Amino acid sequence: MLYYMANRCRRCGACEAVCPQKAISSQYASPFRINRKQCDRCMLCVDACLYNALQISGEWYTTDQLMKVIERDKCFYGKDGGVTISGGEPLSNGEFVLEIFKRCKAQGIGTVLDTTGYGDSGLLEKILAYTDLVLLDIKHMDPVLHKKWTGVSNELIHKNAELITSTVETRISLPLVAGVNADPENIHATAKFAVAHGVKHIDINPLHTLGAGKYHYLGKRSPYGRFRTLEKPELDEVAEIFHSYGLQAGFGRMM
């Protein structure tokens, strides 16, 4: 992805001059613009920018390149460490994940898959054969509301959850958003889902706004203004509901 950081830009015009698609307008008389539909992501503008106002977010890796990074850090993993692949959704690059996990296990490196469970079941089953732990993101239990907030049904997710929890140790990761999935009804439903699938631990991940700046860099409007941050007493109430079902519940990474 192409980031634009306005506070670093000097409007020198170097990026506009090298853009083969004419997708950049950097004239002082008007706001700096990137036509992202016109941009073909050649990234020549990034190379031309002397002030790092234009940057590439993310890197492309082959399996060999990524394994070199993983092997380089192997001395830090110790007995219980290893590699976690998350996303986005790792199952959207499932063949890549499968190859990395195979090579990790061949070297005795622990593997963790952080997934929503939304992906091809056959490929998921292959990946699970080389997975030590799954962090299963459960966004919402209600199928209608799940589709409203995520754009997809949770039917496939629930199907794959059966496969995951019957195959590999699993923890549920709950990204918690006020007004979306933090109501008691959904928390109770999530707890029942966990118990029914033999899951013992819930990681509660409250919404934060640390990623708001990234939307700005991408020329997009941040959605975070629509949602408030949950207060500690509210979070404690959520944890207590999970505890009442005999589940371990703690606050994991902030989402």
Where are these regions (language model features)?
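Iron-sulfur cluster-binding cysteine motifs and their immediate structural context
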Residues: 14-34, 44-60
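Short glycine/proline- and charge-enriched loop/turn segments
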Residues: 216-225
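N-terminal pre-triad scaffold of radical SAM enzymes
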Residues: 1-14, 32-41
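Conserved AdoMet/S-adenosylmethionine-binding subsite of the radical SAM
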Residues: 64-217
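C-terminal accessory regions of radical SAM enzymes
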Residues: 185-197, 214, 233-255
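Conserved dinucleotide-binding and phosphotransfer motif residues
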Residues: 22, 52, 106-107, 245
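Conserved beta-strand termini and adjacent loop/short-helix elements that scaffold enzyme active sites
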Residues: 57, 205-207, 252-254
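Short, flexible active-site recognition loops that position polar ligands and cofactors
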Residues: 224-234
